[in-house]
């Protein structure tokens, strides 16, 4: 909720208000393993493009090289994250950061709870999201899931350079939107 006197979209933010805009996690990455597949995720359940070794791999090839959740273009805040004892399921509790525009709070931190659950198993890799609104009214904002695939060999991900590699073509859609 917005602190008393702190704008809920109608009042300006106090000069003493410290907005919650990001989370720094000191947790180690989560590694999911199933048969010839494995996934390396950050504690949020994200996969970043940077040379972190994160991704979803099958038979030594990285298929998914990016999977990132954004709320109004911003990363969520991490509340907690846990890997189950089978190393096939990770659960991350997330919330929204303060969304501020023009000195006014559009959505106060902790208004939304996001449960991000990620599974790796016989049916493949799956990530689901459940959102709960703890605010007094409806919330209308963009929720983006950014993803990419590079089909990199596991050794390339670790830093080995190939002499030749195929090129990435333009994105094609199977149907008109």
Features from the language model and the residues they span:
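Terminal accessory carbohydrate-recognition/targeting modules of carbohydrate-active enzymes
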Residues: 1-177
